[in-house]
Design a protein with these regions (language model features):
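A small/polar active-site loop signature that marks catalytic segments
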Residues: 75-250
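Short, intrinsically disordered, charge-balanced linker/junction segments flanking boundaries
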Residues: 252-254
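Polar, glycine-rich mid-to-C-terminal structural blocks
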Residues: 1-79
């Protein structure tokens, strides 16, 4: 048999107005119907003396059948991570430019996973192999197969997420764009548009003028998002007066 990483719950998950320079870097990791490893992978660099070229030594995590291909032009210079990644977010070929601190070993530069669902299928296969369950067919992601080819499904295990207040805590405290986008898609049952409508309906029912906000995503990474100061003030006032909203929201602030 084979393992299928089913990512079909979400529709297109990269908001249309995210810029090309963001969608390959760690903060631009888009949601997936089957997210895994926070939809990011690490390139482990070794840097030398100031001005020398840094080299990629390893990747974590790795796929079982597909290898990353990284065109790297990273210089050992400065005191901070100033490396940036470009390329097709769904491709295993990446371009990395910029600089990282000199004289480092296993220095981590993060980028977006090309296919989180396939990696999840790979890692599940590895775990099954370790306990003696052997699979003789290559893994797939549901993006590449027709749903009709899956004849039947049997629920074998359910894993529950942390409660919503804990997810919100991490989202706000760490400014986690991936979590914010995933929450929006969950509200919209896989659709960015329907998620935005759900947010607007929530505040409209509480008396706010939703014509004062224009949302294109859940995190604010897109540059077209706009909100008036009046809407923000009224929203915070509503949260403050609602004990169910105020406690988890206030706890989540840095």
């Amino acid at each position: 048999g084979k393992i299928i990483g089913d990512a079909s719950y979400f529709n297109k998950s990269i908001p249309a107005n995210w810029i090309w320079g963001d969608i390959n870097n760690y903060f631009g990791a888009a949601p997936c119907g089957l997210s895994f490893y926070d939809n990011k992978f690490k390139m482990l660099y070794s840097s030398g003396s100031i001005g020398s070229k840094a080299e990629v030594k390893n990747y974590k995590p790795q796929y079982s059948t597909i290898q990353y291909s990284v065109n790297s032009n990273v210089i050992s210079k400065g005191t901070e991570d100033d490396a940036y990644v470009t390329g097709d977010p769904f491709s295993f070929v990446k371009d990395v430019n910029g600089k990282i601190p000199p004289n480092k070993t296993n220095y981590e530069v993060e980028a977006v996973l090309p296919d989180p669902a396939l990696l999840c299928a790979d890692k599940l296969t590895e775990s099954l192999n370790k306990i003696g369950v052997k699979l003789n067919r290559q893994n797939f992601c549901s993006n590449y197969i027709k749903p009709d080819s899956v004849v039947s499904k049997l629920l074998m295990f359910t894993h529950y997420s942390p409660t919503l207040d804990k997810i919100v805590y991490h989202t706000n405290l760490k400014s986690n764009n991936l979590y914010a986008e995933t929450i929006l898609l969950a509200l919209g049952k896989g659709s960015i548009y329907m998620g935005i409508e759900a947010v607007k309906n929530f505040w409209q029912k509480r008396g706010l003028d939703v014509s004062e906000i224009y949302m294109t995503d859940g995190s604010g990474l897109g540059r077209a998002n706009t909100v008036t100061t009046n809407f923000q003030a009224n929203m915070l006032a509503k949260i403050y007066k609602d004990s169910l909203l105020y406690k988890p929201f206030n706890h989540s602030l840095p």
